[in-house]
Amino acid sequence: MEFQYRGNKTVLSNCYQNPPLRASRPLYINPANRSEATVYLVETSGGIVEGDHNVFDIDIKEGADVCLIPQSATKIYPSYNGIWSSQDMDITIGPKASLSFKTEAVIPFEQARFNSKTVIQMTSDSTFLWGDILSPGRVARGEVFEYTDVRTNFQVWMDDECLIYDPLLISKDNMGLKKMGMLEDHLFIGSMWFVTPTIEEFDIRELNERLQESPHSKASASMLEGKAVNVRWLASDLVDLKKEMNRIWDEFANYIV
């Protein structure tokens, strides 16, 4: 997908899509920024099946503002033959452009093996807001950390220098997830990244104080080299976690405006 700023709004100037991946037409629904293009990302097959490899290539040109929203949680089906499912996202954010990627969950089913890599290339005057949740499985069916392996690698490069390198590996057979210093009694891992040119003005201490007020999760925020804010959550209820993450998301989004 390619986005450009034309005629006082951001347009989807190029979109090549191959089933089961689909992108909606741009919507202009942000009352705070009517030029921002909101696009829904749809997985028409209902999930990533064993051996599937999903690829997203997103190029946001200078001055364009984009919000991408997954239509639903990403479901990872079992890998009965031990073959990994994978997803790669390569994103470029041009000068004075912005991308907001709305929070949604990844749900690995029993015996799933999933590898995800996300690489964002941006400039020092562009803006980036990202949220994601890793679920322990289909909790309502009693699947809690029954998947085999999940690997994620999240990178952000600013002006060709690595600003964020955030790998995660959860392998239930090789980790004591309930041990102290691991997940303990929590089930869900939430993460949010916010990068914007004026981030140094953000009050990280005040944000941390408010994060501690939530009775439903453990959370903490940190400032990275005065260029990015990262917030992490551990929670046992997905609904409560989403509410808390959406609240912080809205705060960051308003800060952009």
From Swiss-Prot:
It comes from the Bacteria. One of its GO terms (cellular component) is cytoplasm. The keyword tRNA processing does not apply. Its main location: cytoplasm. Disulfide bonds: none annotated. Pfam families: UreD. Keywords: Chaperone, Cytoplasm, Nickel insertion. One of its GO terms (molecular function) is nickel cation binding. It is found in: Cytoplasm. The keyword Cytoplasm applies. PANTHER family: UREASE ACCESSORY PROTEIN D. Belongs to the UreD family. Required for maturation of urease via the functional incorporation of the urease nickel metallocenter. This is Urease accessory protein UreD. The lineage of its organism: Bacteria, Bacillati, Bacillota, Bacilli, Bacillales.
